Amino acid sequence: NNKIMAKTAFKGTPVTLAGEFVKVETPAPEFTLVKGDLSNYTLKDGKGKYLVLNIFPSMDTGVCATSVRKFNQLAANRPNVTVLAISKDLPFAQGRFCTTEGIANVVPLSDYRYTSDFAQKYGVLMTDGPLAGLLARSVVVINPEGKVVYTELVPEITQEPNYEAALKAVE
């Protein structure tokens, strides 16, 4: 296996990711994540719309919370766009956060149930460092035909993603 492992950093310290970060112009890998009502959400559930996958370690950190709020605003007037907020947080915690923050335009999804199936397929599972086992901060945009059209693996986990670039991908 000579695939190049993706890297990110946490407070300047390099962090290795499992697998290969998903690439632009490739079919989006199938995934199953868990919704707030504990039912499954799959790639097929988002078919026909642009999917903006906002991927991050936990909603309970400042930068992650900010990214969810900003993507919530960006999705407000775009009926052809579904924003998925994806973390390892339990659906209960995700639901509490979204209710407290008035987040209505984002679908919170958890990767807790299927042994990081999503994280492995998309190449966003951190394998070392203090956040090992959590998802690396990244953004993936999938077009209505199911093709990856934009990706960003944020180089430093404590930084916010490039919202404008992600938004351009859905216009």
Q: Model-derived features: where do they sit?
A:
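Chalcogenol-based redox active-site neighborhoods
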Residues: 2-171
